[in-house]
Amino acid sequence: QHLFWFFGHPEVYILILPGFGMVSHIVAYYAGKKEPFGYMGMVWAMMAIGLLGFIVWAHHMFTVGMDVDTRAYFTSATMVIAIPTGVKVFSWLATLHGGAIKWETPLLWALGFIFLFTVGGLTGIVLANSSLDIVLHDTYYVVAHFHYVLSMGAVFAIMGGFVHWFPLFSGYTLHPTWSKIHFGVMFV
């Protein structure tokens, strides 16, 4: 199991990084800003998330009989990932603050991503606690956590990027009303 999760866990943190970049571009653009709030903090946060993903793999293995010190380490290390993640969410919201916001579809996808990612992150903090994780192991709570963060989160970021850059790549624009309806149906 250690071999599997040592590879498999960092992968999910790396998979979400392009979504972070797309959301940063979209939020800054539709807030009328040149760059996101706290640009260097965002860069360091992405690097920290990428690196911390390599030292928390065993939080997938709390139920296999690890000793208490090992569980305490992996609980703490997993919770530390919430700090750079919180920096990113705060910076996206701070970028929107005081901006001339254009409420177009890509921004809706980005805001949907921020909401879903935040809910998924809160469920992740609960699951990082090894005592609670043992109770919640193999339940829909865990399924909800990774679907909020990666399945829906990554899809919303990708859709935001697609809707934002599709006119640039193709020369065609998407119908604004139908694309907003598409977002609404996906969000519900």
Swiss-Prot record:
- Residues binding O2 are Y13
Q: Cite the location of the cross-link 1'-histidyl-3'-tyrosine (His-Tyr) from the record.
A: H9-Y13
So where does this one cross the membrane? 1-30, 39-55, 68-96, 105-126, 140-169, 176-188
Q: How does it assemble?
A: Component of the cytochrome c oxidase (complex IV, CIV), a multisubunit enzyme composed of 14 subunits. The complex is composed of a catalytic core of 3 subunits MT-CO1, MT-CO2 and MT-CO3, encoded in the mitochondrial DNA, and 11 supernumerary subunits COX4I, COX5A, COX5B, COX6A, COX6B, COX6C, COX7A, COX7B, COX7C, COX8 and NDUFA4, which are encoded in the nuclear genome.
> What cofactor does its activity depend on?
heme; Cu cation
InterPro entries linked to this entry? Cyt_c_oxase-like_su1_dom (IPR023616), Cyt_c_oxase-like_su1_sf (IPR036927), Cyt_C_Oxase_1 (IPR000883), Cyt_c_Oxase_su1_BS (IPR023615)
Using the UniProt record, name the top-level EC class of this enzyme in a single word.
Answer: translocase
Keywords, A to Z?
Copper, Electron transport, Heme, Iron, Magnesium, Membrane, Metal-binding, Mitochondrion, Mitochondrion inner membrane, Respiratory chain, Sodium, Translocase, Transmembrane, Transmembrane helix, Transport
Positions with a binding annotation for Mg(2+): H137, D138
Is Transport given among the entry's keywords?
A: yes
This chain belongs to which protein, by name?
Cytochrome c oxidase subunit 1
* Family statement drawn from the similarity comment of this UniProt entry: Belongs to the heme-copper respiratory oxidase family.
What the record notes about the co-factor is: Binds 2 heme A groups non-covalently per subunit. Binds a copper B center.
GO BP, one annotated term: electron transport coupled proton transport
The residues on the Mitochondrial intermembrane side of the membrane are 56-67, 127-139
Q: Which organism is it from?
A: Amia calva (Bowfin)
Family annotation (PROSITE patterns): COX1, COX1_CUB
Which E.C. number(s) belong to this protein? 7.1.1.9
Looking up Pfam families in the UniProt record yields: COX1
Q: Which residues bind Fe(II)-heme a?
A: H147
Record's function text: Component of the cytochrome c oxidase, the last enzyme in the mitochondrial electron transport chain which drives oxidative phosphorylation. The respiratory chain contains 3 multisubunit complexes succinate dehydrogenase (complex II, CII), ubiquinol-cytochrome c oxidoreductase (cytochrome b-c1 complex, complex III, CIII) and cytochrome c oxidase (complex IV, CIV), that cooperate to transfer electrons derived from NADH and succinate to molecular oxygen, creating an electrochemical gradient over the inner membrane that drives transmembrane transport and the ATP synthase.
Q: Does the keyword Metal-binding apply?
A: yes
Q: What pathway, per the record? A: Energy metabolism; oxidative phosphorylation
Q: Which reaction does it catalyse?
A: 4 Fe(II)-[cytochrome c] + O2 + 8 H(+)(in) = 4 Fe(III)-[cytochrome c] + 2 H2O + 4 H(+)(out)
